[in-house]
């Protein structure tokens, strides 16, 4: 892939008039795309689920719930709702990023191998539009939790078309490697972030992120 084939974009703000949703049969859940101001009840329920999932592994501080709860930095969010009406997973999307300094990835990699590569990958793509997936989780006790995680992962690239950007990125805690940056371009399935060394974190089986995008 060469970025010369891509066109720089102007950042745009998205405003939904209503929630978007689709039934995902293999996961037996309804996947909803919304915005914090449009559906504050669903937004708060999603956040509380994220808090429970992260607290289970003692990493709730990484959510920074006080800072994100007003939704001001969140362009849109995804919520998976099971047949009983419970929110069993979700993720939120921020951006477009103006530079690597807008991404929490540079904080996560501070003092670790791969920081310069993370910065370069974000900065090289920022002119073409990059959004970041944050606060992803799935209730590991839910029926079909693996299918729910897969449904969320399949849906996350939708943020590129909704927000008019070329790339989606994120960091995720893997069971062995720790967080690794991943990118998906609208014209390519390349995942250049796979070569970046991770940073060790506790095993986090129900924290889901862009490692499932490929």
What are these regions (language model features)?
Residues 92-139:
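Conserved acyl-donor/pantetheine-binding loop and adjacent beta-alpha core of acyl/acetyltransferases
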Residues 74-78, 129, 200-208:
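Short beta-strand micro-motifs in enzyme catalytic cores
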Residues 68-79, 86, 98-102:
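A short helix-loop-beta-strand connector motif used in the catalytic cores of GNAT acetyltransferases and
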Residues 85-89, 182:
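Glycine-rich acetyl-CoA-binding "A-motif" of GNAT/NAT acetyltransferases
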Residues 1-61, 69, 136-140, 161-214:
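Terminal substrate-recognition subdomain of acyl/acetyltransferases
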Residues 144-160:
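Conserved acetyl-CoA-binding loop-helix of GNAT-fold acetyltransferases
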Residues 64-69, 77, 119-123:
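Catalytic micro-motifs at enzyme active sites that drive phosphoryl/nucleotidyl and oxygen chemistry
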Residues 115, 133, 157-160, 168:
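Aromatic (often tryptophan-rich) hydrophobic motifs at membrane interfaces
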């Amino acid at each position: 892939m060469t970025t010369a084939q891509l066109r720089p974009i102007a950042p745009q703000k998205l405003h939904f008039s209503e929630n978007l949703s689709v039934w995902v049969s293999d996961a037996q859940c309804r996947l909803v795309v919304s915005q914090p101001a449009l559906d504050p009840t669903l937004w708060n329920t999603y956040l509380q689920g994220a808090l429970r999932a992260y607290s289970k592994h003692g990493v709730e501080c990484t959510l920074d719930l006080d800072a994100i709860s007003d939704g001001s930095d969140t362009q849109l969010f995804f919520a998976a709702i099971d047949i009983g009406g419970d929110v069993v997973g979700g993720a939120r999307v921020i951006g477009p990023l103006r530079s690597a300094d807008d991404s929490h990835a540079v904080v996560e990699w501070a003092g670790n191998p791969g920081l310069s590569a993370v910065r370069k990958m974000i900065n090289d793509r920022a002119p073409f539009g990059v959004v970041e997936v944050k606060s992803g989780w799935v209730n590991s006790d839910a029926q079909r939790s693996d299918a729910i995680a897969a449904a969320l992962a399949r849906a996350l690239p939708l943020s590129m078309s909704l927000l008019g950007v070329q790339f989606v990125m994120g960091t995720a805690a893997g069971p062995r490697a720790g967080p690794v940056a991943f990118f998906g371009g609208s014209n390519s399935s390349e995942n250049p972030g796979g070569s970046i060394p991770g940073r060790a974190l506790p095993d986090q089986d129900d924290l889901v992120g862009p490692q499932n995008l490929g």
